[in-house]
Amino acid sequence: MAKSLSGLWLRSLRSITKTQRAQTRLMKSLLPKPARSPLGRPAKAKSPARRVKAPAAAPKTVKPVARAAPLPGSWKLSYFSATSPARAASGKRMAYWLYLPSGASASAANLPQPLPLVVMLHGCQQTAPDFATATRMNQLAERKGFAVLYPQQSAASDAHRCWHWYQRSIQKGQGDVQVMADMITQVRQRHGLDASRTYAAGLSAGAALATILALRHPELIAALGVHSAPVFGAADSAISGYRVMQHGAAAVVGEVAGVAARAIASARPPQGGMPAIVIHGDRDAVVRRINARQLGQQLQIINAATITRAEATRQTFPARTSGRSPKRAYSSTTHYAGRKPQLVQCDISTLGHAWSGGDDSMRFSAREGPDASLMMWTFFSRHFLG
């Protein structure tokens, strides 16, 4: 079913390009040529067996990992395996990359103070190094002084490296979500990172999984940042996942949010809630903007007990086309808990399915701002557990 969703996603993009002549470079990049079999024949899209044998696009997404680390800090690949007997029985092993800014020792004893940790989850057809390069999050971490953890989906688990956010078991916090929770705990202990300042962020399928991680483990995650995310809890299969991406949720927006709100309230008293920033482009044809609106509604329910102002603050920012840092026009809606922003929704004009303000030499990244990485870190830095 995971490969089914990936195939539907790619076929949707092919259909879009047939009907829209004014294509952006991003949308063109989403159209890999048909994979060829070892005998040189194109893999047949209509045959499920052929798709299993020839997962077309995955090899094309791998970029040179050196691009992600032209920085003075530490950038290393590691592998996480569960250590407890109960977890180890699953046999799950997950690769991850970790960036530690310069001056941060691998030994907790040598750190002047514990560093915050941002967990970054890539989207489909990306690797962890791709995502690090595209978002420029490591550069920001070097400037601001925080660690960045990039779990990576394996091509064996999904040919397009998509996270399976639409599966009910995942939505309940099992599978990859539990593996990541254990990974975060291990990485924080090993490197002496701040357990009260751990944040989850992601793009597209990675944003969907970051949402689940935050809502299922509010004792670990202090705040959430999502870019181009599907609404939470509305899918139960690959087919319905694709439908949600295109049309949003039918009826369960409030129901699943209410359940999540009650779970969080019991897991992290007296705070409750889950601080979150939601970023979406108004021309996203992969995960339609209705998802951002519905996810925002869910997060309002989840944060209802902590939001103290009846009215949200709304701001608009004009486009900037000249200078070294061009920006698209965008608007933001902010709900406050006291003086802290508790929930921010940012709608970016003319942006497609791409990380705003990133490295546009990479797939699913747009150079023009606003800078989504900086916006997320600015929001995260206001929140901590305890």
Q: What function would you assign to each model-found segment?
A:
Residues 1-117, 129-135, 201-205, 209, ...:
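A domain-start/cap signature at the N-terminus of enzymes
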